[in-house]
């Protein structure tokens, strides 16, 4: 069941107020990727328990698996059931058309990432297509996020170490961030400061001095992608500097899979899926709760 334009605009207005609160109250909202209804429930339970605002997000693969509008309906249903402040983000949308469909479906947050589909996309193409989404989003008030180039990793569990000499080549710069924000009019800039998609065998190292310089250079919100596997103290410091949104995916997937595998080993004769899920809910919820606490968003929800 689709939302009316008045309902969508009401939601995006509340989403904008949330992002303003992150700056004023020095917290970040967690953006938690969901792969299915079970992970959505885990996020909702964590948000309710800690009275925290949350974003749930889906990328292209999840959209294809679950359906753009189906995800919208699920989020609205659980938001109402749990009485929580929860919004929906399209994560790493690779096409203008896909982003427009999400805007029409009432997604409050849109991440347009042209370089996701084409790592060699030109600056001109990235700016033009990002600007097109920004203009389209004005009809509903959806907040648009983007970045000027692709940065590496994948939302998986990796066995290789992190090559920071290579990663540094993709770091954001204050000058580049300012130029991109001014050229596109985005609401949120996705900074690259050592954050990397995926979970690695070594902890990630974030350049907080660079983050502070970027914060000084731009007026809009700042997000950090690739939050999984990052020592929590980095998040605590990033929030103080002024990061408003932090993405988490691989840590949740790892908790889901490893807990499910353990549960299956311990219950070899159980075939009722709903009876196998309770430990999985708990494991994923614990991951979400730990991030919420590090992001300083406990008791920051406005319902």
Regions found by a protein language model. Name each.
Residues 13-21, 36-62, 68-83, 87, ...:
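Alpha/beta enzyme core
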Residues 2-5, 231-303:
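C-terminal alpha-helical cap/extension of soluble enzyme domains
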Residues 203-205, 210, 217-220, 269, ...:
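Active-site-adjacent C-terminal substructures of enzyme catalytic domains
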Residues 1-30:
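N-terminal amphipathic alpha-helix/helix-capping segment at the start of soluble metabolic enzymes
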Residues 9, 120, 201, 278, ...:
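Charge-dense, low-complexity intrinsically disordered segments
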Residues 147, 225-228:
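Glycine-rich beta-strand-to-loop/alpha-helix junction loops that act as flexible
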């Amino acid at each position: 069941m689709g939302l009316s334009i008045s309902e969508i605009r009401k939601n995006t207005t509340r989403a904008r107020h949330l992002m303003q609160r992150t700056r004023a109250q020095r917290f970040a909202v967690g953006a938690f990727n969901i792969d299915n209804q079970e992970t959505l429930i885990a996020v909702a339970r964590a948000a309710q328990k800690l009275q925290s605002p949350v974003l749930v997000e889906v990328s292209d693969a999840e959209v294809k698996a679950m359906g753009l509008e189906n995800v919208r309906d699920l989020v609205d249903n659980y938001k109402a059931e749990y009485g929580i402040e929860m919004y929906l983000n399209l994560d790493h949308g690779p096409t203008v058309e896909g982003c427009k469909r999400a805007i029409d479906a009432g997604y409050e947050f849109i991440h347009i990432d042209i370089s996701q589909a084409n790592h060699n996309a030109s600056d001109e193409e990235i700016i033009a297509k990002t600007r097109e989404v920004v203009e389209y989003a004005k009809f509903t008030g959806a907040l648009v996020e983007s970045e000027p180039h692709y940065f590496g990793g994948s939302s998986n569990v990796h066995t290789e170490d992190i090559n920071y000499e290579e990663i540094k080549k993709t770091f954001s710069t204050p000058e580049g961030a300012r130029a991109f924000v001014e050229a596109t009019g985005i609401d949120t800039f996705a900074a690259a400061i050592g954050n990397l998609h995926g979970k690695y065998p070594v902890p990630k190292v974030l350049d907080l001095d660079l983050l502070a310089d970027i914060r000084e250079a731009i007026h809009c919100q700042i997000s950090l992608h690739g939050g999984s596997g990052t020592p929590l103290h980095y998040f605590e410091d990033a929030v103080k500097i002024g990061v408003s949104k932090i993405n988490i995916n691989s840590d949740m997937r790892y908790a889901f899979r490893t807990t499910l595998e353990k549960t299956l080993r311990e219950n070899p004769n159980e075939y009722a899926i709903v009876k196998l899920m309770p430990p999985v809910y708990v494991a994923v919820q614990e991951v979400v709760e730990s991030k919420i606490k590090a992001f300083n968003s406990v008791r920051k929800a406005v319902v």
